[in-house]
């Protein structure tokens, strides 16, 4: 499972959240993905699970450009996808919170938000989920001060929204992969997000 943890702050407008999830493969050199469930809450409008290898973006694992909270289902892939050691997966969610007047936080309630991708794969490895989240160290080194700052933002200002977006991009990312019952922690580290300058470009359609 690839997740966006509940301490992520979602600003009050439409945006995409990009969080890279590095997979802990143990002694395996690859595993095969054969199905997927992508999930967000009421503000979710689109979800894509993206795949990166050696600095290049590969075709996405799954794309849902018209996500509907009331219509969610597990989907089998038409072709199994190989994930190799060193690859990265990223769950990208687009939200529309223009009808709300206050920031939306990540969390478990329906009015909170999530950005999840439940991946079905084989062979089995003792791993339940990988999660990543910005730690907002580009805003303030003190986590308590960060929340005070975010609550004071004037989210109706385009300049404030653009500044926040840039600060998130500059923030360090906390990442961990964990096993059953939250133990053991296979990986836990802080890194800076890197995305290729050029994303995946799908081939042109041959349909008339």
Predicted regions and their residues:
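Beta-strand-centric surfaces of beta-sandwich/beta-rich domains
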Residues: 1-208
